[in-house]
Every structure is written in C-alpha cells, then in structure tokens.
C-alpha cells in the first residue's frame, strides 16, 4: 500500500497545478492500480486476465490562481506511480 497517507492535497493562492487536471490524472492512475490488483487476483485464481495499459508520467497543467501545491501533488503522484509499477512487476513475474 502507499506509505504516506494522503487525506487531502494542499492548495495555494498563486500558482500550483490545475485542480481538475490533477484530479483526472490521479483518478487515471488509481483506476490503473485497481485494474492491476484485479488482474493479480485473477492470475492467482488461474483465470484469464488482461494487463492494463501503463499510465506513465505526464506534465500537469499549471494554474495562475488557486491550484494544488506542487510538492504535495508531485509526492502523491510519485507514490501512486510507484505502487502501479510494483503491481505491474508482480503481475509480470
């Protein structure tokens, strides 16, 4: 599981990442994690499974006013991508 518990993302008055773009990206990675976990479970049970496509890193849109704080978002996304990579490695081994 993700080591750092993230209850919320901090916002900032100026700068940061666009909120909607950030949340969409987090949702995409989280969906990939759920699909990987499901595939691992199917593999354990001997069922057919499909390896989901890899999301990978992408550049988030910036925000002039009221975006999410970059350090928090970067840390959280890094943790999510790490979890996805760990699950993908487990599935492919």
Task: Name each region found by the language model.
Residues 1-93:
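Acidic, negatively charged sequence signal
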């Amino acid at each position: 599981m993700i080591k750092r518990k993230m209850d919320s993302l901090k916002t900032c008055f100026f700068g940061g990442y666009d909120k909607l773009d950030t949340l969409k990206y987090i949702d995409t990675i989280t969906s990939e994690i759920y699909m990987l976990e499901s595939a691992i479970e199917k593999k354990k049970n001997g069922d057919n499974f499909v390896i989901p496509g890899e999301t990978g890193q992408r550049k988030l849109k910036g925000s002039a006013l009221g975006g999410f704080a970059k350090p928090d978002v970067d840390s959280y996304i890094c943790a999510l991508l790490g979890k996805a990579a760990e699950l993908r490695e487990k599935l492919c081994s």
